[in-house]
């Protein structure tokens, strides 16, 4: 579609409009810069009117632009209608009555029809404005198409770049996994090749330290006669290899003396197993079968036989004896 040329009336009309706008919004005022910039962008020029439309542009405009018809522009009957409605003449009236009122308004020259020349000039102005709007629409749509095409062209390159990055990351992960497996294998090989440490190699470690601590302990307690322990009290006699009765052992603290606080002072209080205990009667110990224990339960290498009553034992001759030297043998026949 070929372009149109600007008529003299349209040129004069546009010049007058430009003067009005520039007179109202002066360039000296900095606040009017935006308004003047918008006016310069939307102003109709001869180049806009001379621009032809292509078939694709016409098709796109017809498909994407809504057609609007203003039936009230330069219509004297519309003006008469507004006057009658303002007076309330059309309230509850029929259509026939309304049409008769329009004819009457024109006949009596209440309203006059617009001249054809005036209507043609106004239509020319509207056509120029419409073409300016259409050119703006086409330019905007073309920019969007260009942006979409550039985005589509860049998307394959971006996808290839992302795939390359993923491949590199996968390769790095595989290399790291291989390195970790190799290091683990080397560690296992070193652990296997490392010579084992035997128990003989560890013998003697810490002996000097134990001897040094033992000598210091003896030096601390050498001058403490209150806490001195008789050699016979810590000597352990061999325990009977047979079954022994340990029940009902009296561990009363009847032998505590005034020297007990000395044990707490020097931190050398003996255990209850090493304290002298009173000797029980044979009858009290014989009547405790529930406390009978096997020698595997009580394995003691350092039990004081003189200060602790182990219990009676029967020899091959049928005589009940005690390990304590103070107890006398008991004849079984006399008891029966």
From Swiss-Prot:
User: Where does it live in the cell?
Assistant: Nucleus; Chromosome, Telomere
Q: Which GO terms describe its molecular function?
A: telomeric DNA binding
Q: Does the keyword Kinase apply?
A: no
Q: Where is this motif: Su(var)205-binding Pro-containing repeat 1?
A: 225-231
Q: Ranges of Polar residues compositional bias? A: 308-327
Return the annotated region ranges for Disordered: 137-158, 199-218, 308-336
Segments carrying motif Su(var)205-binding Pro-containing repeat 2: 289-295
What's the protein here called? Telomere-binding protein cav
Tell me the organism's taxonomic lineage: Eukaryota, Metazoa, Ecdysozoa, Arthropoda, Hexapoda
């Amino acid at each position: 579609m070929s372009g149109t040329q600007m008529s003299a009336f349209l040129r004069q009309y546009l010049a007058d409009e430009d003067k009005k706008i520039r007179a109202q919004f002066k360039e000296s005022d900095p606040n009017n810069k935006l308004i003047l910039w918008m006016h310069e962008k939307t102003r109709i020029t001869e180049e806009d009117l001379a621009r032809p439309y292509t078939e694709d542009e016409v098709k796109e405009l017809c498909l994407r632009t809504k057609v609007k018809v203003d039936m009230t522009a330069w219509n004297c009957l519309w003006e008469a209608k507004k006057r009658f409605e303002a007076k309330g003449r059309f309230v509850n009236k029929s259509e026939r009555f309304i049409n008769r009122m329009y004819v009457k308004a024109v006949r009596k020259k209440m309203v006059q029809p617009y001249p054809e020349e005036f209507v043609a000039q106004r239509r020319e102005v509207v056509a120029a404005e419409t073409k300016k709007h259409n050119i703006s629409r086409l330019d905007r749509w073309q920019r969007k198409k260009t942006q979409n095409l550039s985005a589509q062209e860049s998307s394959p390159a971006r996808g290839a770049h992302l795939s390359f990055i993923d491949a590199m990351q996968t390769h790095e992960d595989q290399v790291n996994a291989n390195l970790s497996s190799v290091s683990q294998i080397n560690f296992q090989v070193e652990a296997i090749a490392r010579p084992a440490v035997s128990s003989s190699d560890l013998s003697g470690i810490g002996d000097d330290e134990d001897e040094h601590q033992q000598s210091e302990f003896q030096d601390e307690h050498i001058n403490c006669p209150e806490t001195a322990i008789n050699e016979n009290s810590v000597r352990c006699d061999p325990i009977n290899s047979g079954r022994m009765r340990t029940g009902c052992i009296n561990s009363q603290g009847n032998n505590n003396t005034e020297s007990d606080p000395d044990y707490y002072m020097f931190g050398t209080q003996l255990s209850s197993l090493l304290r002298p205990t009173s000797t029980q009667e044979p009858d009290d110990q014989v009547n405790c079968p529930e406390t009978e224990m096997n020698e595997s339960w009580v394995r003691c290498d350092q039990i004081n036989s003189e200060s602790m009553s182990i219990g009676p034992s029967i020899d091959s001759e049928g005589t009940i004896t005690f390990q304590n030297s103070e107890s006398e043998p008991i004849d079984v026949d006399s008891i029966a």
